């Protein structure tokens, strides 16, 4: 154990003033040379405009930000450590609570990593992959709507808040119908998805697709040409491509700087290479460019969802491996659909072997060959990666999340320093951090 002097100066070049040393005239002269309005303030962690319990330590000279430091960790929940004490299936229920605004992306990245270690990536049913893509794109739109609503509210556009949450509610109703929950779904599982789409889900999604394009046009009419909105975002929070790459920023931050880096295109998964969509980019690298990128991404997600609905064919939604899938998941009805309550009731009540098999899988889980993998997906905030290590048992040896919120927060100093204190709100909002994922 190493001991350190708590009174040591962290920065050797910083001036040290004591009551027993130094020439007081020199001390007074040194302080007099500083800006008379220099102050240090805390923004957060209890602040309505920091997207959760984010703390910013700002050094100000008048209204200008001379230094911006990020303090994280206030929402640490030990998700990664808890996964080491749960089976590979149970870990999904923890990971879905990391980035609580886009849980389906964390679930997918984790399940893809497990499937890669199991060597069953190519065995995932087509219907399961289509459902995964469709759910993720719905979740992408929902996440961007929260960003639009909260970001608009923070800079005074209260109408954007009302409209954003209005449309998001439609998506949450779809999620509730399909997964049973509005958030923290644990719907995507190793090998596929937990259950098939219920009756009426496709119709409800098509209804949303009919409504949403006009609503996006409404957002543009409301905000894109609005003078106050443009002045609050244009030229604010600038970060060029060199800075974004140096700081590891991904997602809309990088695409707003002009680089079309999207993992759905450059490293496809779940069959994304077969879908027709564009990667929106801008070149200005400011808050307004990030706003335009996210608005365009919602349109592209609608295109992908439309293609998913056209590709839905009857079939299983779980890999046909009895060592991984529960017996009820391997049943198909006459219509080609599976996982209805009738199927589960029939299998669990008539087959003792199936009941025993189900009990063993639920209580002990399945074994995953030893090894380690890293699997990234394109979340609404950027590259969300899962580094999974297996020791050959039924529980993960290590699960690490490469959370884009955590990495992207490194850009706070770059986008805030030199600007006005009022622009800090807009700059942080354009980064769109979710502290549940950042602190996890």
UniProtKB/Swiss-Prot annotation:
Tagged with keyword Cell membrane: yes
Main location: membrane
CC terms in the record's Gene Ontology section: plasma membrane
Reaction it catalyzes: a quinone + NADH + 5 H(+)(in) = a quinol + NAD(+) + 4 H(+)(out)
EC assignment: 7.1.1.-
Pfam families to which the protein is assigned, alphabetical: Complex1_49kDa
GO MF entries: NAD binding; NADH:ubiquinone reductase (non-electrogenic) activity; quinone binding
Subcellular location: Cell membrane
Membrane-related topology note: Peripheral membrane protein
Family listed: Belongs to the complex I 49 kDa subunit family.
Subunit record text: NDH-1 is composed of 14 different subunits. Subunits NuoB, C, D, E, F, and G constitute the peripheral sector of the complex.
Name of the protein in question: NADH-quinone oxidoreductase subunit D
Organism of provenance: Acidothermus cellulolyticus (strain ATCC 43068 / DSM 8971 / 11B)
